[in-house]
Amino acid sequence: MKKFIVLAALLAAGVAQAGGYTSLEYYDEHNRATGADNIKEAIVVGMKEGAMDYSLKMENSQTEFGNGSISQGMEIRVKRTFDMFYLGGRLGEKVTSSANFSHYAVDAGVKIPLGAGFTGDVGARYRNAFETGHSYETTRAHVAVGYALTKQDSVAVRWSRSWGDEEKDAVRLQYTRSF
């Protein structure tokens, strides 16, 4: 994991020089099947070139800070924007106390300008593990509202619902700084 952190730091430095962005994310999740609550935090480092968005996401999840089992994940993400809608793909690695496996995901959605610095986002994601037996096949729908604080700073809130192998409702708070 230390190598991934060093790699991410190097990537962040390179992206910052290329005119990229960094996002900090906080998730509050509720598992509808078990009633368990969970928190997750993530950092995303990325770069936009025209209609393309390339990013690396690292996340850490736990039932509460300092208590409970920890899971970690890393994803390489590519997204293409077409006028108002977008399509994306992800390749990732998930590490839990009992498993370590690779996965993929496909995203699609619509970004809607709402005016006065606000933007809406409605979309969906399909995700699954490459190898069978990991119980990771999940579809997620989301709705989000973002606000541009400045030309370089934005905040967003997203509500999502997942179903399949994960039955979760989640709220995500996000801060993004563009360079």
Question: What name fits each language-model region?
Answer:
Residues M1-S23:
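Cleavable N-terminal export/targeting peptides
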Residues F82-A129:
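Surface-exposed, polar helix/loop patches in the mature regions of secreted/periplasmic/lumenal proteins
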